[in-house]
Amino acid sequence: MLAVPASRATTPRRPRIGVVKFASCDGCQLTLLDLEDDLLAIADRLDIVEFAEATSNRSSGPFDILFVEGSISTPEQAVDIVRLRAATSTLVTIGACATSGGIQALRNWADHDAVRSLVYPDPEYVESLATATPVADHVAVDAELRGCPISPDQLREFVTATLAGRRPDLPDEAVCAECKRRNVVCVAVAEGVTCLGPVTRSGCGALCPAYGRGCYGCFGPRESANGEGLATWLGRDRDPADTARSFALFNAWSPPFRRVIDAAGGPPGPIDGRSIKEPADA
């Protein structure tokens, strides 16, 4: 077989990777940086062209893979995500904010102007949408990495699987399955602790139940989650508002959790639209 002359040899193009954020805390981006040695091991196989947390490089595309953190909460963000989608081959949302709206989506149940007046001294200068929504409400999403923050193990699996050309193995079982594997006693049955494990997607390693606390639903509802069924069981001996409060956290705006909250009349607490007064007339 004839050898290819050096002048004619070709090197496969490294995939162009971007990481961007919208309304979020940056925690999921930091999870990517926390991979440290694992990230360095594959760095020469990637071309990171946009990642404000890690590099001064800037790019508006095109991207082979774009990781998106954060919910869409402003008119500018709604425009930007459409532009980024058009410049991206594979768009991956990372974290509860991007996949379900995040903790800030609790404001979706309240009066928009009332919330702005409560938070900002001069709300007329703040442009925001009436709702904070997941990226998938605005553009097509190719893959989701859930969690608050995301799991470094799942992130590592996604990146390595994508580079190897295989489908990532991202489980959709309940947190309860992780408790069984770790021999963690069910806190809901044994201790009467409120736990969203039966309806929450696995990925955390049953972290909270392992320390005797109920699952807070950080990874959002699993595909076949029966939120209403769990709410009925939890609500046997407690006020419906307390049950709704259990679902009104990081993934409150996800449909299975939202239905439970809606049935209770909205999320209780200080962000509740019933407890925020209308802004006073100037």
What are these model-derived regions, one by one?
Residues 92-94:
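Active-site neighborhood of phospho(di)ester-bond hydrolases with catalytic His/Asp-centered motifs
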Residues 105-106:
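Active-site-proximal loop->helix
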Residues 70-72, 96:
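Short glycine-/small-residue-rich Rossmann-like dinucleotide-binding loops
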Residues 1-67, 77-78, 82-90, 113-282:
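Iron-sulfur (Fe-S) cluster-binding modules
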Residues 97-102:
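Short gly/pro/ser/thr-enriched loop/turn and capping motifs at secondary-structure boundaries
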